[in-house]
Structure formats: structure tokens, C-alpha cells
């Protein structure tokens, strides 16, 4: 395993280029299973989750070539089974279920892995695909599906904690080749879902209502190959924006998707950061104090749950008491115990955290538990006195492309080394 050694105290100044969106890339890669023709996808980030997905596609029979951010895929499917050893490492692997049912008429996909951040069931995926006509059951930890002829229908994907993003992806992909018209009510509106819809349209799918809670998909007989460029990652951009604000730096976030970052940028302004929209991207800086804030996570366009941990880290050094309410994944607070090791003062009650700002954090060894928690610990390390060691950084490699190199390029003192832990 590897760890980061961070010596805090340096303001971050310069330019960081934002990578392609991980949460767009994974379902888009899965969607290439819908056609035997070649798909060329640009701006694919070099992440461990991406590499896992490409390994799954190769196992299923796809020819894959990945070089310098561009993936070329030609899917000649020889297997419709994705075993546990392949899918256990990431949750988004469930995205292959819908395409396999649509293309092969059957699928066997082990229940997925990924971040451990509370209850994230796939019941809405299964319900939606069943309504299209798939016969699905869970057998020994595998989702076993027989498709037959998929037929358009009306499906509601609204769940207990809002609309399901991956569930919307799965049902939308399967519906593209179903007979007739499918109407998805309660569809997730996230930019990454809209990006997938645009990709499917480039393949010949007929989809309307993109970016809204109602998607209308008219089934077509077949989809074709295409060339497509993925949107940039709003969560990566938001994370670096928080880093600039926390370190009292000045960063230009090149190609940051400003149109997808409204709630995050507004909250940064409330906290005392300066936000300037430039031709190349977004410039984030801070000269005055960091102010306490309140956030409530919500489905897009609300405040994203994937930015909650990073703002929690920022709150530890803001003036006053901040309040965070986590409504999407109520148990997504595994970073709090580790932030406390650095001197953070945090009270946790169910899905709410009160963070009392302190003048300084003090470096210590900490353990990453999931993707966004690891980002929060790195951010805290950037402002902590002395040295912070962040262990199990394989979590952060799942969603941030070369984060240590990007931070080093703008002045951070961060080193990746081998760790026995």
C-alpha cells in the first residue's frame, strides 16, 4: 500500500487542469456494450476505477485500447457473466447489467463493491429493469437476469433518499433498445446522467427530457459506434476549489465545469472565498478569514453529497460553528473520527455534524476510509501544522487523477511513499 506524507502550511498558487468526470466515464464505458461497433471516448481519467471497468469489459469480450485519455472500445461480447473477483472493487460495475440484458438477453453480475458509506441498495435498478420485462433474481450474491423481449413502460425511480443516479443510468441504457416508449419518472438530474444520455444519443438513441426528472426514451432496433468527449469532473474541481480557499491560495481551475458547480461555488463565496469566472475556467482565492457555514446535501442541483467531506474539512479551520446535514447517505461521516485526530472539534448526531472551527490543526497519522473521506484528510493535511500521514490512499486513486502531482505543481508539500499499513 501507499500513503501521502503532507507538510502543511503552503498556499496553493498556479493552475490545475481538471480531468474528465469519473462518474460520467464509468456508465459511458458500460454503454459501449450496447453496440458491436467501435466507440472512441476522449477525456477518460486515468483512475483505478476506470481501469477496473476496462478489465470487466475486456473479460466480457471487448477489445480495449486506452492511451493518453482516449479509450477505443469494440464490444464483441463472449460472456454475459461478470464474476465477483472483477466487480467487487467498485459500485459502478452494476452499470453493465442494463446493457448486458439489452444486448444479450441475459446477464449474471455479482453484487458490487466500492466505498463503504452506508446503505446503497440496488433495489431500484432491479425494479426498473423488471418493469421493462427482465426476469431478475438474486442467487448466491449474484444478480441473475433473463431479458427476453424488453418493452417500454412507465417507471418511477424515486427512492427514500432521492433519485438513484446509477439506477437511472441502468434503466436508461436498457430502455434504448426496448420495444416502444419508456418514460422514467423521478429520474436523476445529475450532469453525469445527462452526459450519458448525450452519449447514447450519439450512438443513435432517441432520448428527450435530458437533465430533467422525466426521461422519455423511444426504443430503437440497434445502436452504432460514435466518438465522444466526456464532461470535466465537478467534484474534482470543487475539491481543488476548497483547497485554494483553505490554504489562502490562488488557483485557476482550467476547464472546470462552472455550469455544474453552482451550489458549491455559492457556498464557497459565503465562506469568504473569491470566485472569478475566466475564459480558461474558474479562479478561486481567499484573502480574508474563512467563515462558518451551513450545508444540507441534496440531489442535483442541490449541494452534492460528494463534496460534504471536503467542506467538513474546511469547517474545521473556519471561524465559528458550521453545521452539515447529510440527507443522501446519512452514515457518510467516517472522516470525522480521523479529522479529530488532527485536532478538529466535531459533534456528530445521526445525520448532522456540528464543526467548531479551531485556529490550527496538528499533523498526525490518519486512515482513509473511502474516496471523498480521503480527499478531506488530504485537505486537512494541507493546512495542519507539522506532518500529516494519510494511509490507504488507494481510496483517493479511485476518483482523483494524480492528485499528489497536481497539488505538488501548485506548491503543496506532498509525497507518495510505500506504507506497510
Curated annotation (Swiss-Prot):
Pfam families: EPSP_synthase
UniProt main location, coarse: cytoplasm
GO biological process, one term: cell division
Modified residue annotations for 2-(S-cysteinyl)pyruvic acid O-phosphothioketal: 115
GO cellular component, one term: cytoplasm
Amino-acid positions noted as binding phosphoenolpyruvate in the UniProt annotation, renumbered to this chain: 22-23
Keyword Lipid biosynthesis part of the UniProt annotation: no
Pathway as given in its UniProt record: Cell wall biogenesis; peptidoglycan biosynthesis
Catalysed reactions, semicolon-separated: phosphoenolpyruvate + UDP-N-acetyl-alpha-D-glucosamine = UDP-N-acetyl-3-O-(1-carboxyvinyl)-alpha-D-glucosamine + phosphate
Single Gene Ontology MF annotation: UDP-N-acetylglucosamine 1-carboxyvinyltransferase activity
Residues annotated to bind UDP-N-acetyl-alpha-D-glucosamine: 91, 120-124, 306, 328
Active site positions: 115
Keyword Nucleotide-binding: no
EC number: 2.5.1.7
Location relative to the cell: Cytoplasm
Superkingdom of the organism of origin: Bacteria
Primary enzyme class: transferase
Keywords for the protein's UniProt record, in alphabetical order: Cell cycle, Cell division, Cell shape, Cell wall biogenesis/degradation, Cytoplasm, Peptidoglycan synthesis, Pyruvate, Transferase
InterPro entries found in the cross-reference section: Enolpyruvate_Tfrase_dom (IPR001986), Enolpyruvate_Tfrase_sf (IPR036968), MurA_subfamily (IPR050068), RNA3'P_cycl/enolpyr_Trfase_a/b (IPR013792), UDP_GlcNAc_COvinyl_MurA (IPR005750)
Family label: Belongs to the EPSP synthase family. MurA subfamily.
Cross-referenced NCBIfam families: murA, PRK09369.1
Function: Cell wall formation. Adds enolpyruvyl to UDP-N-acetylglucosamine.
Protein name stated in the entry: UDP-N-acetylglucosamine 1-carboxyvinyltransferase
Organism of derivation: Methylacidiphilum infernorum (isolate V4) (Methylokorus infernorum (strain V4))
